[in-house]
C-alpha cells in the first residue's frame, strides 16, 4: 500500500542550501508517496511544526560536551511555510510535490546549526508512513564567495627568506558579503576555541580597483577581536569576480 512521507525523513535530517541575503530566500523540502505507481487521486497533506523534535534529536545524537553544536530551531519570525497545513500532491502531476519555505537569512550565525522541525499530521486518501513522517530541515548557509579554494602564496618573517605555502582552504560565509577562513597554514577545525584564535574575516566591498571592472577591494580583520590574531590589513587585498580568486596581503 502506498504511503505518504517526507523525503529525507528516513535519515531524520534533510539538508538544504540557503544563501545569505538581505531579501527573503526560498528553499524546498518534498512530500512524496512510496512506490513508483501513480496516485489515483489528489492527496491533501496537513503538516505542522513540532519543536519537540529538535530537543529529542539533540539529546539522542549529541553529548553534553557538544552543546555548542546542538541544532537550534529557527525562530518562527524568520521563516514561513505557506502551504504547511494544506499541501496537495496532484495525482495528474506525479507522486510528489515540493513544499516552499521562505527564510530570512541575513541575521543567521554561521556557527549555529539551524533547523526547521516538520511533521506530517494527517493526509487524505493514503496513510502516513510511520517511519517517514517527521524530520528536521537543516539549513546549510552559503554566499557568493564561500566554498573550497586552493591557497598558494608565501609568508615572510622579518629578516628571513619568504617561505612558499600551499594549502586547500574552506571559506565559510558569515554574511551577504563576508567570509571567514583559517589564516596562513592554520589547520581547519570546527572547535570553538580554534575558530576564535585562528580565523580571519574578509569583507568583499563594492569598491572596484581602479583600472579594472571585475576586481573588488577586500578588507581583513580577525574574526574574534579579543582572542584572534593581531591582523594588520595592508589595504591591498582583492577579489576577482571573473576568476573567483582572492588575493590577500596582511600581517
What is each residue range found by the language model?
Residues 1-85, 96-251:
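Intrinsically disordered, low-complexity regulatory regions in eukaryotic proteins
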Amino acid at each position: 500500500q502506498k504511503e505518504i512521507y517526507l523525503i529525507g525523513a528516513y535519515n531524520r535530517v534533510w539538508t538544504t542550501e540557503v544563501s545569505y541575503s538581505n531579501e527573503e530566500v526560498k528553499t524546498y523540502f518534498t512530500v512524496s508517496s512510496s512506490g513508483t505507481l501513480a496516485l489515483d487521486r489528489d492527496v491533501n497533506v496537513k503538516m505542522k511544526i513540532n519543536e519537540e523534535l529538535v530537543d529529542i534529536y539533540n539529546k539522542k545524537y549529541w553529548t553534553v560536551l557538544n552543546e555548542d553544536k546542538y541544532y537550534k530551531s529557527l525562530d518562527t519570525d524568520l521563516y514561513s511555510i505557506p502551504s504547511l497545513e494544506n499541501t496537495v500532491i496532484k495525482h495528474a502531476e506525479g507522486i510528489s510535490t515540493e513544499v516552499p519555505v521562505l527564510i530570512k537569512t541575513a541575521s543567521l550565525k554561521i556557527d549555529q546549526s539551524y533547523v526547521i522541525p516538520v511533521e506530517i499530521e494527517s493526509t487524505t486518501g493514503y496513510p502516513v508512513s510511520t517511519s517517514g513522517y517527521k524530520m528536521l530541515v537543516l539549513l546549510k548557509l552559503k554566499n557568493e564567495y564561500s566554498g573550497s579554494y586552493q591557497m598558494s602564496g608565501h609568508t615572510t618573517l622579518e629578516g628571513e627568506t619568504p617561505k612558499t605555502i600551499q594549502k586547500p582552504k574552506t571559506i565559510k560565509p558569515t554574511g551577504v558579503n563576508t567570509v571567514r577562513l583559517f589564516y596562513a597554514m592554520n589547520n581547519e577545525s570546527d572547535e570553538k576555541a580554534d575558530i576564535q584564535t585562528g580565523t580571519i574575516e574578509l569583507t568583499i566591498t563594492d569598491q572596484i580597483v581602479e583600472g579594472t571592472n571585475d576586481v573588488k577591494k577586500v578588507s581583513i580583520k580577525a574574526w574574534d577581536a579579543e582572542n584572534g590574531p593581531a591582523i594588520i590589513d595592508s589595504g591591498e587585498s582583492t577579489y576577482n569576480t571573473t576568476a573567483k580568486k582572492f588575493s590577500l596581503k596582511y600581517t
